[in-house]
């Protein structure tokens, strides 16, 4: 009897697993694995510890996020994305980029993507940008503004930039 129950259970789980695999596309699965690798476990653990009301507030807050922002500040145009513009072509409209293109792709900081728009990115610590003379600080070149100043690295810090004035703001570095 135990063997029969065990076999039935395994068979049922296999059907559910097969169904789940058919319904989950490869890109979503890759994104979930990458998210888990980059701290998703801690996020889920902390989220589950919240009371239902606070969970709802967090979800409502997250629903307001966008994958990109197009801004005009004074006379200047800006495109803000977390990562980059994966699969960039000049003809491609911003709406055509996937979540992966905008969140996980890294831009080529030696390339000017737009002559009339500044591309503001995070995700790539400025310490890892080739030919960067000032690692750990905001990088500006070729109409790029890279604001990830590698807070996770020795000597790294959090950074922000005021697009109206160009003024840069930094936390103290993580060494002190």
Feature map (PLM): residue ranges:
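Core catalytic region of metal-dependent phosphoesterases/phosphodiesterases
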Residues: 1-27, 31
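Short, charged, surface-exposed secondary-structure boundary motifs
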Residues: 11-12, 155-159
